[in-house]
């Protein structure tokens, strides 16, 4: 996603900021003659970042956080989009003019961390100006996210950066975890999903259910080599955004090829943003259909039970 954003909105200018939901921003961006819409969601149940063609208008009265962003970066230029390691964090560095006409820089940081997801607005020194969600000391003993506090990334020192991990670090990390080797990989490396960890084991010919201690030194070395080959595609930007379907139901998505999904049908897309929108909108539609059918079954079952009881009473 970072690669895609750098290809599309780098050096582009923000033209509009809306806050359609309490935990969501829709940022309209112009790059030459092309208009992009960037959705930033810090939803606890479905945090997302992607480019979309669909517009989501904000409320008539903009929330305070939205008004603050409009004041500071309503016409800012996007200087960079970065990701620390492979953390689930995107940092947008923005350049704008202040009230005096001086050039200033700010950071908009999006953390995709489940129920702890947040969108945080900071100055260039990392001082928090405001955030879409305030986190007090009573809410979290790990980190406060409040205006005036210094921003820092939540502690992930127990995990290694897969882009820089050496063979010794990789093997030591998975040996330290007495669990299936695929789980040991994604538990030890930032940004590695269970699907990708399974794929690395599959490509290396390693039984993912075995522990690292069950593997010989040669096999562990081979596993590390396969891991580095896979990460090389990330370094080179060799992405193949795809969704894997079981019938009409989307089961998984990936920016990199997943060859062990033999039973699923693969559909490739132009961008990871298109993948994210298609995957989650389809899943939501199927979930709603399932819920409505379940509700309908409940109504029918209740009516049948009621009529059955009436029939039994009339038969006596």
Regions found by a protein language model. Name each.
Residues 1-316:
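Extended, highly charged segments
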């Amino acid at each position: 996603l970072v690669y895609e954003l750098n290809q599309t909105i780098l050096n582009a200018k923000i033209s509009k900021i809306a806050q359609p939901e309490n935990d969501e921003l829709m940022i309209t961006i112009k790059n030459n003659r092309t208009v992009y819409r960037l959705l930033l969601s810090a939803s606890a149940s479905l945090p997302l970042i992607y480019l979309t063609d669909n517009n989501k208008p904000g409320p008539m009265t903009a929330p305070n956080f939205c008004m603050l962003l409009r004041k500071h970066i309503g016409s800012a230029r996007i200087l960079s989009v970065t990701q620390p390691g492979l953390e689930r964090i995107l940092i947008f560095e923005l350049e704008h003019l202040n009230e005096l006409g001086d050039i200033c820089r700010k950071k908009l940081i999006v953390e995709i961390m489940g129920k702890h997801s947040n969108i945080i607005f900071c100055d260039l020194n990392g001082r928090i100006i405001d955030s879409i969600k305030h986190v007090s000391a009573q809410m979290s003993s790990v980190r406060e996210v409040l205006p005036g506090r210094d921003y820092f990334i939540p502690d992930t020192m127990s995990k290694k950066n897969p882009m820089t991990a050496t063979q010794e670090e990789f093997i030591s990390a998975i040996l330290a975890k007495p669990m299936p080797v695929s789980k040991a990989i994604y538990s030890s490396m930032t940004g590695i999903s269970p699907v990708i960890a399974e794929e690395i084991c599959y490509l290396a010919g390693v039984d993912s259910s075995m522990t690292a201690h069950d593997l010989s030194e040669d096999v562990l070395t081979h596993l590390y080599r396969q891991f580095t080959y896979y990460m090389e595609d990330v370094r080179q930007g060799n992405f193949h955004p795809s969704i894997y379907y079981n019938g009409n139901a989307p089961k998984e998505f990936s920016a990199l090829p997943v060859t062990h999904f033999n039973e699923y049908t693969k559909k490739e897309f132009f961008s990871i943003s298109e993948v994210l929108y298609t995957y989650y909108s389809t899943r939501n539609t199927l979930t709603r259909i399932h819920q409505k059918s379940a509700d309908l079954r409940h109504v029918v079952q209740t009516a049948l039970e009621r009529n059955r009881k009436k029939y039994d009473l009339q038969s006596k």
